[in-house]
Each structure stands twice: as C-alpha cells, then as structure tokens.
Amino acid sequence: MTHTGLATYRLVREGYLTAEIVHTLVQQYYQNYHCYLPLVPRSYFGKDALDQFAISDKHLLTAVLTIASNDLVDQPHIHQSISRYMHDLVSGVAAGHDCDVEAVEALLLLAEWEPPGLRNNIEVVGRGEEDRSAWMHVGMALRTGYFLSLDRTAFRQESDEEAKIDARKRFAWANCYVSDRLISVRIGRAFWSRGPGPMTGLSTRDFPTLQPQFDGDEDYAKVFQAQLDLTQLFSNVHDVLYSGMRSSNQMMLLGDYVKYVDDFRTAIDRWQMTWGNIQCSQHIKITLDMSYQYLRLYTNAFVFQAQISQAISKKKKDKPLREHLRQVFSNVGAMPDARFIWGSVAAAKQFLNMLATQVDPTRHLRYMPLRFYLYTIYSAVFLYKARSFGVLSDQEQRAVCTLIYSCIDVLRQASLSPHHAGSRYARLLELLWMRPLKLGQPYHPMQSPAARSDSQLSSTGSIRMDAGGYMQYSPADFSWLDLEAVGDFVSGDPMPNQVAFMGMNSYQNPAHFMPSPDTMNWQAQKSVAHFQLDLNGNLLF
C-alpha cells in the first residue's frame, strides 16, 4: 500500500522511519497506552488513516511515536530520532508556530509519560526530575489551549449535535484541567489554570467520542467522568490544605483543619460509593482505585504533618528534638487526631499493596502514566517518615519492609531498561529502605533545627540548610513529596560498595553500627553531612 500522505511526514521523508515502522508503533501505542488517556481519535488507529494522521496531526502522531518507540530497547536510534523531531515540534509551539488542538493533545500525552529521549540527562536513581518536564508541558498545553479558545468548550452546549462538533476540543480542554491539577498536586505548586474548568455540569454525554460504539467496547466516557470527579477532590484538598506555606502553617498550629479534613474524607468516601464498582477493564479500574488511595493519603497526611508542627512548637529548649517527637508519637491512639494519622498510614499501605498484588508489571504497569510510579514512591517515602517518628510498631515495620521489597520487585519487572521509570525508582526505594549500614560508616550527630535561626530554604522549597551545611527541619515543609530531597539523601551511596545510611538491619540493632570516620571517602562525607540522621539512620523530614 502506498502512503502518499505519510511519505510527506518528515521522519519518513528523510529516511528515519518507514511506513511499516510507523504503523507498528501506532498499533503498539493503541494496544498498550491509549486506554489510560484516550486522546487520540479512534479513527486514526486504522492503517488506512495513517496518511490523514500524518498530514493533519503531525504533533499528535509524533507524540504517539515518541512514547511507543521507548519500548524498542534493541533499536534505541529510532526513539532518539523521533524524540529529536518531537523536541523541534515542541520548540515550535513554544515559539508561536501555527498549531491546532492536536498540539495540545500531544503536549498532554508527553506530560503523562515523559519519554526519556526528551531529556538531556537521565540518572540511574529517580529523583522526580520528570515532574519538571511534565509541569512545563502541561503549562504549554494550557496556554496553547487558551490561545485556541478551548476554554469556551467548558460549558454545556445547547444540543447533542453541537456537543459532537466541539467534542474533541472539549475533551482536550478537560484533560488540560485534569493534568494541571494532578501535576500541581504532585509538585506542590499553584495551578496553571484559574479559568472555567470542565466541572460546569458536564457529564458522559458531553464526550460522545469516548462512548462505546459496539458491544464490548470500553466506556471511556464513564471512566473519564469518574476521573473528573476525583480530580475535583484533589483540586479542593490542594487548594484548602496545601494552598500556601503561610496559611498551611497557621492552619497546622491552630488546629482548625479538622473540619476541612473531615469534610474531605466524607466526600472521598462518597466518590468511592459512586465509582468504586465502575464496570470497566481491571487494568483501568485499578488506576482509579490507586488514585483514590493516594487521595486518601494526601488528605490525611496533612494532619500527620500538623501534629509534627504542633509538637515542635511545644518542645522545651533543653530537650532533644528527636527524643521529643518520638515521645509525642509513641502513643498515637491517645492523640486527638489519631484517626487521621492511622488513615494516612493505612492509605499508603493500601496503595502499595495494590501495586504489589493487583497490577501486572509487564502487561499493564509498564505502560501506565508516570504518576502511578511517583505515587508509589511518595507512599513509600511517607511510610519511611512514619517509621522515623515511631508511628509504626515493630510488627508493622517488618510488614511494611516486606511490602516495599515486593513493590521494588514489581517496579523492576515493569522496566525494559535501566532508563525506565520503574528501574530508576526501584533503585531509589532500595537505597531508602533496604541497604544496611556497613562498619566504618561515619556518624554525623543530629542538630536540632529549632536551635538554629540561620537556615535557608533550598531551591526545592523543602530542605533547609544551616550555616554548617546540615539539613534543617521546618514544620511548614511537606518534604515527603520532595523526591529531589530524597534523592539527595540517598546519593551518599553512589557506588555499590558504599552505603548511604542505616537500613532496617541497623534499625533493629543500632548498637552494632557505630561509625569510624577515618574509613569514609570524601564524596560520602560531603553527601551525608548535609542530612540529619538519628542512631537508627532515619531521615528527619
């Protein structure tokens, strides 16, 4: 078959790809990725539609090829060639070149998966660096959408016929809203979009292109409605609880967050009652279930942080901070906010248990959007934080450690190469949870953050350093969400024969792991010295 339209597509015209490779990649994308974000019109997945796809929607086609080609680990040059072209197209959009709704769709797809070919440097240990790229791609998508007046489709149309005319634009704009909210929640930034969102009375009938055409087709319209409702809850929680450092800190110290958190918990439970039994494919439903559990964690974790803030504000000057915090959290059941603290821990464990037991790593997790990998890491880091403050019992610690190990195994199985997100973040979890401290590792005594006033906020907004280079804890920080800080912490072990900190073995018997400074090299000294560790090797954050 001759593809006259496809022949004009730059990558085919210049010999980087053949029509057969393009068709194969488009089909692989449809089979593996499309179900998680069905932005590409279904008509483009037929082989006869490749010509029109290449002529009309070159941005969208290139985004599809960029994402799918990342799986061709034996032919990395294909992904590199497509990524270079994708980079040129994105630069063109940023420079104001003519484009249509398909460019917005392409940017949204890139933000969901962030193919490695678009980044200059990929570290072996994941540090959340994909979030920066996603943040920029979503921002460009929103600004382009505003320029194309996609926001006008946020309101219900007069008739079903009008709804069909603007269906593609409306779905693209609705996904701009979803992506904006979810990436902002991940990185703790304000929303890009403050205009009308898609929550102005829209329902499944407003997305006719997502509705099933034949028996057995996936009802993407219903799935997307559930996602919209959940995103609105994420948005509300972020706006009210995490809206700003000053207001959040005041709310923590005054304790007037209880009503908000209780109301949010009720709303989240109602979402579960409405959508918990949605009829769809299991690998799609599990993404909704995992998002629900992460929302529970995100909501309840605010109270956990508030209790830490209140405890620090009441600490006596002559009492060590670590001892004071462990004493406060030694009996969570007696605390007025116990239900929230237990709820956050339970949600984190539920999320990780779902990943370990209900997600096929090679058939499904491998192709899921990046946020589910990051939700996994956030949940694991949160549990590490809970352990640091003595919230977990000895039995819970052992169970959580086993669960983390299972998640590491699942993440690795999902990876096709060391550059895959699963492999990189599995390494981060391994460094954080599983590495025992060897004899000869130096010990840097903990400094009380309350004792110093010359600390500064780092560029990440979550780590404070004093004049001596030690990390300082601030009750207003939410650094269980700061993977760059976690990456900095574990980077004290860049080589296989070095250990960044004490793991579970040292936690159980810290007396066996007293350090000797003279055996530690300069690089490890430089890295570890920036962080506070207690005798159990716990990071204070």
Ranges and model annotations:
Residues Y33-Y36, L109:
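The first (N-terminal) embedded transmembrane alpha-helix
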Residues T2, L6-T8, V12, Y405-L457, ...:
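Intrinsically disordered, low-complexity regulatory regions with latent secondary structure
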Residues T24-L25, Y29-N32:
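Low-complexity, Ser/Thr/Pro/Gly-enriched N-terminal "stalk/linker" regions
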Residues L65-H77, E112-P115, G487-F489, D493, ...:
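A short secondary-structure junction motif
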Residues R205-F207:
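Long, low-complexity intrinsically disordered regions enriched in Pro/Ser/Thr and acidic residues
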Residues L11-H23, Y44-T62, P76-L202, Q213-R270, ...:
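Extended, leucine-rich alpha-helical cores of fungal transcription factors
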Residues G5, L60-I67:
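Short, basic/glycine-rich phosphate-binding loops at helix/coil junctions
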